């Protein structure tokens, strides 16, 4: 489980990215790099880091499922992820 402050910071960053997305795209299209540098640092989508939706874990994130490998394994064993089966060959 990630610290609550880190999860809150990630949510705040996501809001900032959405808030400034249009303005950032317009400045990029114009080539106004001075204007881009005046935008908040956290409004850049490059600074976002994927986090597990269940517990906020930042490492071993699986994009396809939106969760870390630990939670994926646990839910897959319980049969709670549709379309995921244990491999046998």
Swiss-Prot record:
One of its GO terms (molecular function) is structural constituent of ribosome. It comes from the Bacteria. One of its GO terms (cellular component) is cytoplasm. Keywords: Ribonucleoprotein, Ribosomal protein, RNA-binding, rRNA-binding. GO terms for biological process: translation. Gene3D superfamilies: 30s Ribosomal Protein S14, Chain N. Pfam families: Ribosomal_S14 (PF00253). Disulfide bonds: none annotated. InterPro entries: Ribosomal_uS14, Ribosomal_uS14_bac/plastid, Ribosomal_uS14_sf. Binds 16S rRNA, required for the assembly of 30S particles and may also be responsible for determining the conformation of the 16S rRNA at the A site. PANTHER family: 30S RIBOSOMAL PROTEIN S14, SMALL RIBOSOMAL SUBUNIT PROTEIN US14M. Belongs to the universal ribosomal protein uS14 family. Part of the 30S ribosomal subunit. Contacts proteins S3 and S10. This is Small ribosomal subunit protein uS14A. The gene is rpsN.
